[in-house]
Design a protein with these regions (language model features):
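A transmembrane-helix-recognition feature enriched in membrane-embedded lipid enzymes
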Residues: 2-46
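Residue-level signal for inorganic ion chemistry
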Residues: 27, 61, 95, 125, ...
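Walker A (P-loop) phosphate-binding motif
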Residues: 36-87
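Conserved beta-strand elements of the Class I
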Residues: 77-81, 140, 215-219
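Phosphate/Mg2+-binding loops and adjacent switch elements
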Residues: 86-192
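G-domain G4 guanine-recognition motif of GTPases
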Residues: 171-180, 200-205, 219-223, 246-251, ...
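Redox- and metal-dependent alpha/beta enzyme cores, enriched for Fe-S-associated oxidoreductases
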Residues: 210-253
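A short, acidic, amphipathic alpha-helical segment used as a generic capping/interface helix at domain edges
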Residues: 250-266, 275-276
């Protein structure tokens, strides 16, 4: 059973649940701190990693795909590497429809395949926390609305690493809906003055096909459903009902029947994300 993101992860004020998780957070932090780091340089091929330190919903997969498209227009032979997870077939399918994808249980096996097929640049969708690989360029993606949530490490908060780890990376990508990023930029520069900061804004490519004169029931099983809803609202899409499922949710026939029935009862159209 997949669970939704805990609400207290994005609570800006200290709360009891986070405090109760502190002992486990400290334990996991110490394990990570003393884990042997063997940063092997990836030979024979250039590598770019697009990852995050806030777990889920930061826009790294769309950014990886767009980065791949840009490099292809520059005539580079590219591919995207994603570690295989049985419960992430939605992202695997999304990427494979748009780019050459290597998706093995071990990233090193995907690297070997890319080299064998004479790729010039490989883009890792996720992988910043894999300590035995040293990438040529590393991007850290954030969602500007959530930023770092409550600022605590897992499981008390949503962070895989604290902000001090930004000193190890090449650039930050702030994905959002046009929110002010001044405070975020200042925080980033405290930990790495030289780091490059890029900003993107979510812009649905097929928004003109969606009639804003109609009512919509929307549903999604993504890392940040609030951003999906906000993007539609900014484009003047009238949302009557919003249904939220866990990230990487595997929809059943019964789920689809319920969604269709609810839309029929509400007399609305149905709208979801490309990944869903």
């Amino acid at each position: 059973m997949k669970l939704k993101k805990p609400y207290f992860w994005d609570d800006k004020e200290l709360n009891l649940i986070s405090i109760l998780f502190f002992p486990l957070t400290i334990f996991l932090f110490l394990i990570n701190l003393f884990t042997f780091k063997n940063n092997n340089k990836i030979e024979k091929i250039k590598s770019i990693c697009v990852g995050n330190i806030y777990i889920g919903g930061t826009g790294k997969t769309p950014f990886s795909i767009e980065l791949n498209n840009i490099l292809k227009t520059l005539n580079y032979k590219t591919a995207i590497i994603k570690k295989f997870y049985k419960n992430q077939k939605d992202e695997q399918k999304l990427i494979s429809n748009k780019a050459k994808l290597y998706c093995e249980n071990k990233r090193i096996d995907s690297i070997k395949k890319a080299i064998k097929e004479k790729k010039e640049i490989i883009i890792f969708d996720d992988g910043l926390q894999q300590k035995n690989l040293n990438y040529n360029i590393s991007f850290v993606c954030f969602n500007t609305e959530n930023w770092i949530g409550n600022g605590f490490l897992l499981p008390a908060g949503p962070l895989r690493e604290n902000l001090k780890s930004l000193k190890n990376y090449s650039a930050v990508v702030l994905n959002g809906n046009g929110e002010s990023t001044k405070k975020i930029r200042n925080q980033i520069k405290k930990y790495n003055r030289k780091i490059k900061i890029f900003e993107t804004k979510y812009n649905p490519i097929n928004i003109k096909k969606i009639k804003n004169s109609k009512d919509y029931l929307i549903f999604s099983g993504i890392g940040n459903p609030a951003t999906f809803k906000k993007t539609l609202m900014q484009n003047k899409i009238k949302i009557v009902k919003s249904m939220v499922f866990p990230d990487h949710y595997q929809y059943t026939n019964n789920d689809i029947k319920k969604i269709k029935k609810l839309a029929k009862d509400l007399k609305t159209n149905i709208l979801t994300t490309e990944k869903d």
